[in-house]
Amino acid sequence: MSAAFDPSSYATQLDAKVARLRELLAPFGAPEPAVFDSPREHYRLRAEFRLWREDGQRHYAMFAQGDKHKAILIDDFPIASQRINALMPRLKAAWQASEELGNRLFQVEFLTTLAGDAMITMCYHRPLDEAWEVEARQLAEALGVSVIGRSKGKRLVIGRDYAIEELDVAGRVFSYRQPEGAFTQPNGAVNQKMLSWAFEAIGEREDDLLELYCGNGNFTLPLATRVRQVLATEISKTSVNAALSNLDENAVDNVRLVRLSAEELTQALNEVRPFRRLEGIDLKSYEFGTVFVDPPRAGMDPDTCELTRRFERILYISCNPETLAANIAQLQDTHRIERCALFDQFPYTHHMESGVLLVRR
């Protein structure tokens, strides 16, 4: 965390983020941002700890940024979900009591959900065998979780290799598979607010949506209910498979998902060359009115930015307001900001998630 965990200072820290976003978007005539706050504690649904040996025992540990040698021992973690905090001492007691579970265990990862699901990944510097699997199965049953053991590129799965999340958007509950090791939004309460904002911002449409960087379908599912059809792109195989499962589970049947990068999609739309992965998809049949982007921290590269310019509306979720501002600067001659928002995904840090709806001038 970049700032001390202090719930009493939360409002002050949030005000500073709002001021920073206003400052970055002021050159573009942005309206006042809608602000979506976070729970003050127990908001983070995932956590990762190294294990540190001290006084003959292994402890949960984290490290200060830039210092991998001075461990900060962790007994509880108030920013993490209540489920993670409840699991931490029970898991620690299990590895301390069991040679099979504790031997050469060096890292533990927790993933929980608002729906009450939980998964624990245990990482080892040794091969895992049947003896480990027997004890891990007992552990999973005792804790009511899925357990995954990892060792040198191999993994053993006890239960499922994904957690199930359920999010309510405009009165409809969407179910999501969140695969082990894949990206998920860490702050479930704020993610739900973010989905609701995007759902409202796009409005009820009679045309089509193009989505870049769709991940596991976090935004795809609710936004698909607002448009005629969706073409969504993603390059991660794990995320693509999760998104396909999520579409099927939620009976969302107006989405085509293709494994293409933004650069490849640009080439396809410009008819530079054909792609086998687009076989059976007629790009000319789509009437894209909106493009939705949720890029990595680096923002959109200049070519992707130019791709979005051809659309009347650009719905942009950003995890880095500086690169968001840089992208808007590239687009401001053709698009204006109609609405914007700040989502406090990461309390007690300088990081913020933001969203803008850009509309053609």
Swiss-Prot record:
Gene3D superfamilies: 2.40.50.1070, Vaccinia Virus protein VP39
Any one GO MF annotation of this record: rRNA binding
GO CC field: cytosol
UniProt-listed SUPFAM superfamilies: S-adenosyl-L-methionine-dependent methyltransferases (SSF53335)
InterPro entries to which the protein is assigned, alphabetical: MeTrfase_TrmA_AS (IPR030390), MeTrfase_TrmA_CS (IPR030391), SAM-dependent_MTases_sf (IPR029063), TrmA_MeTrfase (IPR011869), U5_MeTrfase_fam (IPR010280)
Methyltransferase is among the record's keywords: yes
Active-site residue numbers: 319, 353
Known role: Dual-specificity methyltransferase that catalyzes the formation of 5-methyluridine at position 54 (m5U54) in all tRNAs, and that of position 341 (m5U341) in tmRNA (transfer-mRNA).
Protein name per UniProt: tRNA/tmRNA (uracil-C(5))-methyltransferase
